[in-house]
């Protein structure tokens, strides 16, 4: 069952002598925290998540060197990226629901510690098998930010303010895979070993982990309220009365309690971990959003895989210069976050006002429609200008549009999920991560064959035509989403 504020209202009515003050109650509600604390939490979570996504494409420019080092073909070396993305897909299935039992902070610190440690054996890999195995575990543990991040931000910000701060978080998701090849491209084109790509990632993740240990706070209200209730139990004179309230809180929030039997604990854990799969398999809204987000994500990763080869073969760039071309994607993403998403927030506020102050998740979606169109346009420009070797600056205009369009599509879709599923946003985000990362893992596998057989022009056009169907899906979600949600609501009492 879900936990509402009314589950705790009786606690405030108990005779309190020493700890019931307005300040102590506010500590249980992250929405009331000082904005400085919430922004610090947002920055740390966003940076951790960015580094996880940074890791997904960090070795792309060094693929030729790895092929030579391990004596394996490119199709097998690319498994280092594929298995990483699969790890990123599976991690949120565990971390997200567990964060709704144990809280966000301990899982963030645990997962990110292991993510940092996984860079050591990856950098020391002596063969391809060792490399891809530790790449998988690196993605699995690093995905904790992807699974919990959106939920943490929804804990701290109201629907009115949520858009701009979650926009910063999603900027980290988008920038990570785009900026990694920039640094790695120069490493690949120099005498420095490819291993330094992972040593640098270890250093960066160590810094962010230290910041998390020092500054990151717990944001999940049921966990905070449970801790507050335990303080009451310790300090109140009327022990029996308070114990009753503690029991009610534990039962209603499904928190793991030391007094529960092992079988009860296992039941709660299994039920909670099943929640993302239940959402994905039974919610039509989730299925539709999964297809939309997965397709866009897959196209972006396909582009990451093809980028280095395009600039080297068609324009004879060095590895370092080809890495710099990823900046165009980053420029588009930054522009979308700081210019276009605020416009979408203004539209959302206007739509809420016209709807008598009632916010609907569908109000987030118009920007996604425009974003998908921007990706389509960018793919056409990129593909055909590269095909005919037009001046290199022109295809970069196309990739800038792709970068902006990705944020414009990805952010509203995830905001829709956060708005619709509220306290269970972390589980819903974990559900979306499954198809999203399957697409992200599979699309790069056929990138080489796609452009080899169709050429860059028609290959990119095929992907753009696929996005036409995606745009129709976004339009359908906007028009009929509310009806679908009302007919098939999520019954959180079962999960």
Swiss-Prot record:
InterPro entries: MFS, MFS_dom, MFS_trans_sf. The keyword Transmembrane applies. It is found in: Membrane. One of its GO terms (cellular component) is prospore membrane. The chain crosses the membrane at residues 43-63, 75-95, 106-126, 128-148, 168-188, 196-216, 284-304, 323-343, 366-386, 390-410, 426-446, 461-481. One of its GO terms (molecular function) is transmembrane transporter activity. One of its GO terms (biological process) is transmembrane transport. Keywords: Membrane, Transmembrane, Transmembrane helix, Transport. SUPFAM superfamilies: MFS general substrate transporter. The keyword Membrane applies. Disruption phenotype: Lead to sensitivity to camptothecin and DNA damaging agents. It is a multi-pass membrane protein. It comes from the Eukaryota. Belongs to the major facilitator superfamily. CAR1 family. This is Uncharacterized transporter mfc1.
């Amino acid at each position: 069952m879900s936990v509402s504020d009314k589950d705790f209202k009786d606690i405030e009515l108990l005779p309190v002598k020493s700890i019931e003050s307005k300040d102590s109650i506010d500590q249980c509600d992250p929405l009331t925290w000082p904005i400085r604390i919430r922004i610090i939490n947002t920055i740390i979570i966003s940076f951790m998540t960015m580094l996880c996504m940074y890791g997904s494409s960090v070795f792309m420019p060094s693929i030729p060197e790895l092929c030579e080092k391990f004596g394996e073909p490119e199709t097998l070396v690319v498994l280092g990226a594929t298995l990483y993305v699969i790890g990123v897909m599976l991690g949120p299935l565990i971390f997200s629901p567990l964060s709704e039992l144990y809280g966000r902070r301990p899982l963030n610190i645990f997962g990110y510690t292991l993510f940092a440690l996984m860079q050591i054996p990856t950098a020391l890999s002596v063969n391809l098998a060792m490399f891809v195995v530790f790449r998988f575990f690196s993605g699995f543990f690093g995905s904790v930010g992807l699974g919990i991040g959106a939920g943490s931000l929804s804990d701290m910000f109201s629907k009115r303010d949520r858009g701009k701060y979650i926009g910063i978080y999603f900027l980290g998701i988008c920038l990570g895979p785009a900026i990694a090849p920039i640094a790695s491209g120069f490493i690949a084109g120099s005498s420095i070993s490819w291993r330094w790509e992972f040593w640098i990632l270890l250093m960066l993740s160590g810094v962010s982990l230290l910041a998390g240990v020092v500054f990151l706070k717990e944001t999940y209200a049921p966990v905070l309220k449970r801790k507050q209730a335990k303080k009451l139990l310790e300090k109140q004179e009327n022990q029996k009365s308070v114990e009753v309230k503690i029991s009610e809180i534990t039962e209603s929030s499904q928190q793991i309690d030391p007094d529960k039997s092992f079988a009860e604990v296992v039941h709660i854990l299994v039920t909670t971990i099943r929640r993302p799969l239940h959402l994905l398999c039974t919610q039509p809204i989730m299925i539709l959003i999964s297809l939309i987000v997965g397709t866009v994500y897959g196209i972006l990763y396909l582009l990451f895989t093809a980028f280095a080869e395009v600039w080297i073969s068609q324009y004879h760039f060095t590895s370092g210069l080809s890495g710099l071309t990823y900046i165009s994607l980053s420029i588009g993403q930054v522009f979308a976050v700081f210019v276009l998403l605020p416009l979408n927030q203004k539209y959302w506020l206007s739509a809420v006002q016209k709807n008598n102050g009632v916010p609907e998740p569908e109000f987030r979606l118009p920007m996604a429609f425009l974003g998908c169109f921007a990706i389509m346009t960018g793919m056409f420009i990129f593909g055909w200008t590269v095909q005919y070797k037009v001046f290199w600056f022109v295809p970069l205009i196309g990739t800038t549009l792709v970068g902006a369009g990705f944020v414009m599509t990805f952010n509203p879709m995830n905001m829709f999920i956060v708005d619709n599923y509220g306290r269970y946003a972390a589980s819903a985000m974990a559900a979306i991560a499954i198809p999203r990362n399957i697409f992200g893992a599979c699309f790069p596998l056929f990138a080489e064959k796609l452009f080899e057989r169709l050429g860059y022009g028609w290959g990119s056009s095929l992907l753009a035509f696929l996005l036409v169907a995606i745009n129709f899906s976004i339009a359908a979600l906007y028009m009929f989403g509310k009806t679908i949600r009302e007919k098939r609501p999520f019954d959180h009492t079962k999960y």
